[in-house]
Structure formats: C-alpha cells, structure tokens
A protein has these predicted regions:
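Classical Sec-dependent N-terminal signal peptides that target proteins to the secretory pathway
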Residues: 1-18
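Terminal, low-structured helical/coil segments at or just beyond the last alpha-helical repeat
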Residues: 35-42, 190-224
Length: 224
C-alpha cells in the first residue's frame, strides 16, 4: 500500500471549501413595528456558528480570499453586537442554556480571531473557556471544545488534559482528539486504541478509518 503522508492540523474530519454566506445585518439587528431597535439573539448565535464552521481551526476553510475578507468583516460586526449586549446588560437577562451559549459564542469569536492571526485572542478565549468550565464543570463538551482549540494552537499537553476530562464525562469524540495528540508525539501505538474507541461511536468517519487502518498496516507516516 502506498505510504500515506499525514499533516496534522487538528481538524476533525475534512471540510471541503464551500460557499460562505455573507452576514445579513438586518436578520440580527432590526426595528419592530413601533420603531424600536431589536436584536435577534438566536440569529446572532447562528451567525457565530456559521463563522465558527469555517474558522474554528487553522488553516481556514474559506473558498477564496474574497470570502475570507467578507467573513472577517462579518466577524467584526458580530463581535460589536456581542459587546453592545454585554455593555447594556442584555446578556445577563439570558438565563440557562441561552446564557451559557452566549458565553460559548464569545469564546468562539476569540478562537476565530486567533485563527485570523489577531494577536492576544488566544488568552481571551482561554479566559472565557475557563469561566465556562467553572460554571458547568460537568459539561464534557466544553472541555472537548477547549481541547480542540488548545490542540490547534499547539498546546498539546493542555489539550490532552482537557480531552481526558471530556472523555471521563462521556464525550466519545474526545477519543479522536487524544489519538491526534498521540500522533503529534509520534506515538502511533498509543493512538490506535483511541481511534478504535472513537470508531465504535462514529463508524462512518472515513478520516478516522484511514488513520486506524494505516496504523495497523504500518503505512502511516506522520509529519507534524
């Protein structure tokens, strides 16, 4: 079998470059029938999610430079809305899952800005993820998402710690993160059990299948 050359970017699955849909300002900020300004926070969350899909990890997944520029412009607009909501105390009126997701979106905006090479954003993301973990220490998904960012920003030891915590809290996808951490350390033997466990829950993940089969066949070459 032909040798497989793997460049580890710590992206989970392979996202083919596709058309980024530019932000529609009016869908988030609008006026009601009485002329009062309103913010649709659900639309705001969705806009953040859309940006995060394309820029959650490096390299960015935009189709071309034009889309990348449009997305960065949208990012700054979305960030301003979040800052306004925070400054006016609107964010505090959101309780439960909505309030938690507001903070998750704030952390993701800093992750995105970091991946756009904006200085100082990693520390800001770290701070908010730390706050989220303190608020919801039993939420394994927060640990896993934070670990994804730590891995993508080349902080392997911290990433491993958070993947372990996520896995202990039942987040099965953390096995893939742990496998990639092992591969980053050139430990194929240590990566394989995590890949096999991951595939028990995500049997259709072709990326993980290729990695596992290549390790078993001794044909995987890893270059960090």
């Amino acid at each position: 079998m032909k040798k497989i050359l793997l460049f580890i970017f710590f992206t989970f699955g392979i996202l083919v470059a596709s058309e980024y849909r530019a932000l529609e300002d009016k869908s988030i900020v609008y006026k009601d029938k009485n002329g009062n300004g309103k913010i649709d926070y659900i639309a705001l969350f969705k806009a953040t999610d859309e940006l995060y899909i394309y820029a959650r990890a490096y390299p960015l997944k935009f189709k071309d430079e034009e889309q990348k520029k449009a997305a960065f412009s949208d990012l700054l607009k979305v960030e301003k809305i979040f800052e306004f909501m925070d400054s006016e105390g609107f964010s505090k009126s959101l309780g439960g899952q909505e309030g938690e997701y507001f903070k998750i979106c704030q952390a993701r905006l800093h992750v995105i800005k970091h991946n756009f090479d904006v200085q100082g954003e990693a520390k800001k993301a770290d701070k908010i993820y730390g706050e989220l973990i303190n608020l919801t220490p039993d939420n394994g998904e927060i640990y896993a998402e934070f670990a994804d960012f730590l891995a993508n920003s080349n902080r392997i030891d911290l990433a491993e710690q958070n993947y372990d915590k996520a896995l202990n809290l039942g987040v099965k996808r953390a096995n893939l993160g742990l496998a990639l951490v092992k591969l980053a350390r050139m430990d194929q033997k240590g990566a394989l059990p995590h890949l096999e466990e991951y595939l028990k829950s995500y049997a259709d993940d072709e990326f993980a299948k290729i990695l596992a089969n290549s390790i078993k066949e001794g044909t995987l070459k890893v270059e960090p």
